[in-house]
Amino acid sequence: MKKIMFAIITILIINKGFSQAKIANQTTLDSISKIVIHYLQAKQADSLYALAGEHFKSQLTEENFKSIANNQVFPLNDFQQITFISTENSVNSYKVDGTPELKLLISLDGKNKLETFLIQPFNN
């Protein structure tokens, strides 16, 4: 009986630990997402790129990122009205109101740097 109680208590403690880690990861993602949104609103491409992880940076140079941000992304929308939609598979989704309506997707890598930073047309 003592072994069963010990096993149950151990499982509960481990489960609580995983829960707290998941909450901490979500809190970090939410915090960095707020910073990303701030930099979008301020049109600070260099600051956005500084938040990027190694994989992200290996796909896009800083100069190319700045060019895309300044010539395509920033003129597209003012990013002033952004609403959280959901989190799925550690990716936060946001609706960006305006013309056109956009969807913003943000995720982090293992070092809490941007892994996914995607802006696409919003579809219901």
Which ranges hold each PLM region?
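Generic structural motif
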Residues: I4, N15, T99, D109-K111, ...
